C-alpha cells in the first residue's frame, strides 16, 4: 500500500476540514479576480486573448493566448527570468483548443491556490507586461 500517499491524503483532508472549503474558495476567487483585472488592462492593447468564459465559477485556472509572441517563449521567459512556473500547450484538451482556435500554439495556463499570495499575482502581471513591452 502507498502509505505516504494515504498519509498525505489524510493531512490534505484534515487541512480542508480545518480551513473550510468556503475560505479556500474565497481566497482562490480573490486571486483569480485580481489576475483577470490585470489581464483585462493588457488585453485592451490586443496583446493577449483569454479564451473561454471568464464569468463562470472558477477553479483558479486561467489560460491565455499571447497574440504577439509565441506562447512557449512567454512560458520559458516567465520561468527563466522571473521564476514563475506555469504550463504551455494543449493541457490534455485538444478539442477544447480547436473550439477556441488555439490548437496550433495552445495557451499558457496559470493556476492559483490557497497558498498563493496577492503579491505573487501582482508580480506575475508585472512580469507579463515587461515581457510584452
Where are these regions (language model features)?
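Pyridoxal 5′-phosphate
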Residues: 1-133
